[in-house]
Regions:
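Phosphate/pyrophosphate-binding betaalpha-module
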Residues: 76-113
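Short, well-ordered amphipathic alpha-helical segments that serve as non-catalytic structural scaffolds
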Residues: 29, 56, 128-130, 162-178, ...
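Glycine/charged-rich beta-loop-alpha catalytic/anionic-binding loops adjacent to active sites
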Residues: 8-19, 36-46, 103-111, 150-151, ...
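Active-site-proximal alpha-helical scaffold in enzymes
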Residues: 29-30, 34-78, 116-138, 227-249
Length: 253
């Protein structure tokens, strides 16, 4: 989009690419996967900012639970590091200004955090009905047993005070999974390294887990990767699966 806006300004509307619209609409990410592989089942792309990839995985799991599909491809990708993308987040004062020490700029939950570092990337997981996976001898890396989502209904960028929305989502996930808060031992936090966001998330964790919150291991992968915006949930889901596979937690936060 940014490239074509520049082209139109410099050379006129006749030079805008005919592929601009197909390239920028979000549903084409899933559309390309279906066309390349001949997948004809449910196909759509959630658009929910930093929760997009997590919603993609969660909604794909719900499709399987409802019997709509037995196998789903889900994930997210992001390519937001453009002049206009950087300028937009900078205008919101969401980015770290620790330019003199970029390697320490992304510091979730640190008292001196001052914003996030933008990143790009993507990840995809294959979700499958358990019985189908077993019947075909598939390697099962992890089981998704609970999913929850909610809305703050508060502000366009700031989380609700006290982390009410995030807490509600975690409670719903625990309820669906049939788990007590005390049965959880690790949380891969959203942890963007923003002042308001990290406070709200910390309060949400404490509200859901109570005293057990102080026994939990909590870390944010963004301390190492930066913030992958729409792809964050998929990347971090893969990190959690690998952590279980190798019995190594991401200790950075």
């Amino acid at each position: 989009l940014a490239e074509n806006i520049h082209t139109m300004a410099e050379k006129g509307p006749g030079r805008v690419s005919p592929f601009m619209v197909p390239a920028m609409i979000t549903n084409m990410a899933a559309g390309q996967v279906s066309m390349l592989n001949g997948f004809k089942g449910p196909n759509y792309c959630p658009t929910s900012a930093c929760a997009t990839a997590a919603h993609s995985i969660g909604e794909a799991a719900e499709m399987i639970r409802r019997g709509v599909a037995s196998i789903m491809v889900a994930g997210g990708s992001e390519a937001v590091i453009t002049p206009i993308g950087i300028a937009g987040f900078n205008a919101n004062k969401a980015l770290s200004t620790r330019n003199e020490s970029p390697e320490t700029a992304s510091r979730p939950f640190d008292v001196s955090r001052d914003g996030f570092v933008m990143a790009e990337g993507g990840a995809v997981v294959i979700l499958e009905d358990y019985e189908v996976a077993v019947s075909r001898g598939a390697t099962i890396y992890a089981e998704l047993i609970g999913y929850g989502l909610s809305a703050d209904a508060h502000h366009i960028t700031s989380p609700a005070p006290g982390g009410e929305g995030a807490g509600r989502a975690m409670k719903l996930a625990l309820k669906q999974a049939g788990l007590a808060p005390s049965e959880v031992n690790y949380i891969n936090a959203h942890g963007t390294s923003t002042h308001a966001g990290d406070i709200a998330e910390t309060m949400a964790i404490k509200s859901v887990f109570g005293e057990h919150a102080f026994k939990l291991a909590v870390s944010s992968s963004k301390s190492q990767l930066g913030h992958l915006i729409g792809a964050a949930g998929a990347i971090e889901a893969v990190i959690c699966v690998l952590a279980m596979q190798h019995a190594i937690l991401d200790r950075k936060s």
